[in-house]
Amino acid sequence: MVVAVLIGGAEAPGRSSSIRGAEGCRMGFPRVMPPVPPTLRASAALLVLCAVARLGGAPDTPAVLVSVSWEKTLIVSRTTPTLQVVVNPMLRPGSPIHDGALAALKAIHARYVRYVPWFPYPRLVVPELEPPSSAGTSWDFSLIDPMTTDFLEATRGEPTVMNFSTIPAWMFRTERPVAYPADPNGLAWDYVQGTELRDPSCREVGDYFARIVEWYTAGGFTDENGRRHSSGLHYEIPIWEVLNEVDFEHATTPRQYTERYDAIVAAVHRVSPKTQFMGLGLGAPSDDADLVEYFLDPSHHRPGAPIDYISYHFYATPAAAESPDTWQFTFFDQADRFLATVRYIEAIRKRLSPATRTDTNEIGSILPGDPGSLTGPPPSIPDRYWNAAGASFAYVFANLARQGIDIVGESQLVGYPSQFPTVTLVDWRNGKPNARYWVLKLLVDHFHPGDRLVETKAEGGDVFAQGFATPSGRSLLLVNRRNTPETVTLPAPGAVLETVDGATGEDAPRSETLGSDTVRLAPFAVATASWR
């Protein structure tokens, strides 16, 4: 229980923008108190915002009561849960976790997995690192193909989103050539430089990406000098995403991005006519309404340029001094602000380009110091973090499903020290999936487009609940948003309960058949209850 402190006969606020742990204060002291001088009242208010934290599981704590109105449909789901795979050295053949990570990707059977060869490792993501000349070209896929074909084989039979997100540095006007490490595993955080393309028509950048697509779909391509390069590869690319986080990279303006998007789309469409296209990939969508508005306006595009999808990202980011006791507020408060941003972007999309679909393809959390100061094994990541991060993702997924978002992608398959270790779904030390992965697998296994989201209430605590009517029966998603246990009363006796919590660790969800209507959710637990 949380105590709201009364100062001088007035109830102190139960929430503070600077002290997050006070959210949810409900139980107050009696209001009959002696007067307190104003100076003491102000001092006391600074000292005691919340005197007692919630005591989950205390005998006098009432159970959270979940009720579901199965006949009241909120929305028919359009939402697919999935993940992204970001290229880094841990995915290379020979890596100690290569096989484990690939097995985890195959086992999840997710649709619309996003594949992103991203700029920090230029030799692993840019197949033409030097500009062409009359003497020849630098096209070389030898380091890139092994990881890319691993991905395409692991996801064979499912639609994917491909995004070779990095424009070669030499295509931009810079004071001097941009250097990159000789070591393929070497980091180059400064590889992205310049703001203006050396070819303002954007034909050069469009042709570059078209050749990459031809390499993987048409068996090869002809380079700038007329020489044929053969790959023997004939994969399909259902969706091509055009660049990534352009609001952070190259100081890209809305007009610049739209011109580059149109040029790339036109070039790729010529060589892969069935491919659909995804735009924006915004890193900070709440700050980029002007970019969204400009890009979604068809009048700013070439005639006939398709805008099949837009995409954008969200990461919860607690402050350095925070702990699990404050993450429980920070993660979900920031998630709610992101959900408000989504509603705003949806209003723009529906007004300007209603046929365009949405992929929120990087959802996660990042702890302070990641990646910059976490260059070695980071003992500062407590096990409970993975549960908190998983709970946050499940909460965001369900609320995005309520808004009709098409794809919700968790970030990312593999991170490790120096490359966002707190974002990983697979333990970089042993290749085993962590709690974030198992939460995603619960969602992939249980919730699909076509399910009905129905009116669901959870009263008396901090558990989030959402009922889904599915072709196989009824399913209930439960998320404990707090760092304390919660007792929950469900309308589901005899249901099969699958749970990810601190006790499951890096193992698969625990499964049990309920013998009563009451369940106990550990801190940051995520569970599904399913029955016919």
Residue ranges and their predicted role:
Residues 317-374:
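Glycoside hydrolase catalytic-domain groove-lining segments
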Residues 43-54:
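Bacterial N-terminal signal peptides
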Residues 30-44:
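Bacterial N-terminal signal peptides that target proteins for export
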Residues 54-242, 248-249, 253-285, 301-306, ...:
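Non-catalytic accessory regions flanking glycosidase/transglycosidase catalytic cores in CAZymes
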Residues 8-13, 18, 23, 28, ...:
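Intrinsic, low-complexity polybasic segments
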Residues 282-311, 363-388, 417-419:
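Substrate-binding cleft/loops of secretory-pathway carbohydrate-active enzymes
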Residues 271, 292-309, 337-352:
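Catalytic-core regions of glycoside hydrolase
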